[in-house]
Amino acid sequence: MRKIWFRSIASLVLCLMGLAGSRARAQEFPVQTKTLKNGMKVLVQSDHSIPNVALYIFYRNGSRNEHPGTTGLSHFFEHMMFNGAKKYGPGDLDKVMEANGGSNNAYTTRDTTVYQDWFPRLALPLIFDIEADRIANLRFDPQKIQSERGVVASERRLRTDNDNGGLLDEQLWATAFIAHPYQWPVVGWMSDIEHWTMEDLKHHFEMGYSPSNATMVVVGDVTPEEIFQLCGKYIEPITPHAPPPPVTTVEPEQLGERRLVVHKPAELPLLLMAYHGPKTNSPDFYALNILRTVLFQGQSSRMYKQLVDKEQIALEVSAFAEPAFDPTAEEIFVQPKQGVDPAVCEKVVYEELERAKSTAITDQELEKAKNIRLVEFYQQMRTISGRANTIGTYEVFFGDFNKLFDAAKNYAAVTKEDVQRAAKTYFGANNRTVATLIPENEQKAKQ
């Protein structure tokens, strides 16, 4: 069944790419929009295939909107928004959601905090009541705040301080960015986590989690009319606050390679690299995605074949770039084998990057990468949750959800020359930061 579905999707992608060449747009589905009086934008896409609903709220507030002393607050509110408000107390949100057959989650990035609800359509009024309560009446109970502060501190210790990959990644971003707030870790610095004040919390919440700073996306067994009516009843009466001040700091051009070395107890070394790249809403977005796919994605990628298959010096290699409002980092991850000097892996990475800059990729590589990207794109759109996240991501990061309908056309338009130009533009030696983790036992052996 899975193979049959994959073939059908692949055929659909090829068909859409052909249509894209004729300036047709990828499968459009109606999305109705409305901006509430308090500034929240609401997007609704009806899908009556199953009696379920996905409701996502995107707040344009992340670690980018913090400063020294308040780092980690956006992530902290990812936790606090589940810890009680005026009508629904601590733990009630999860209990009510589960009792009605639903579930919820949230995630925080450098640019956004996103809250996710999945539930049967019968629970629509209840979910709107819950969301309105925690937006308007979040509880700032000192005892609960102190308890959750401890939870976040423990999370930081687990995922960063005691995780070699997390620690090295934190050090990489703190070194690659010297001016822009992308240098802050999303979880926050431990000293800040320990010293946030009540005033810090209330100010950050009012600033970042106002309806005027949010976009709601609802996908599923709903009609736009009923969603707008529910918004009018539950969400629109909430008083908005001033949004976060604009981030005006521009990261200065990097004029030379930066390097850092971390020594930690570890079984394996680790190599990370960051090249300064563009923001998500950039003309180079699609060309960079194709380049990243050719070089790093899957066992048939250039880097995997060289590092893992041919040279047999690495266990894993990958690359990624997070959605970002401002120029961000193209990050490369290499897991060397035990006993392998990361510098050996580093040399191979540079050789492959230089090859991509000096010689255009092949026609076959280009078409394969386009197919991979489009299959991924349409797989995301299969479910109501994937569609809600994609619609919201395009609305928030590209400035218009309608741009998602141009994805097939934009991928089809990418040429080999575009990919080569992207490699030359962003993957220069002066534009990179290199972070290496050396196991302490190896360091002692060299001394």
Predicted features, each with a name:
Residues 45, 50-76, 90-135, 164-191, ...:
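M16 family metallopeptidases and their MPP-like homologs
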Residues 83-84, 88, 135-143, 361:
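Short, polar/flexible loop-turn hinges at active-site or ligand-entry regions and domain interfaces
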Residues 27-34, 155, 173-214, 224, ...:
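Histidine-acidic residue clusters that define the catalytic metal-binding segment
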Residues 130, 134, 155, 204, ...:
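Generic, well-ordered alpha-helical scaffold segments in large soluble proteins
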Residues 157, 174, 243-300, 410:
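His/Glu-based metal-binding/catalytic segments typifying zinc-dependent metallopeptidases
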Residues 73-81, 291:
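Active-site His/Glu-centered metal-binding helix of metallohydrolases
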Residues 1-12, 20-22:
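Bacterial N-terminal signal peptides that target proteins for export
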Residues 15-42, 223-263, 276, 406-447:
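Proteolytic maturation boundary segments
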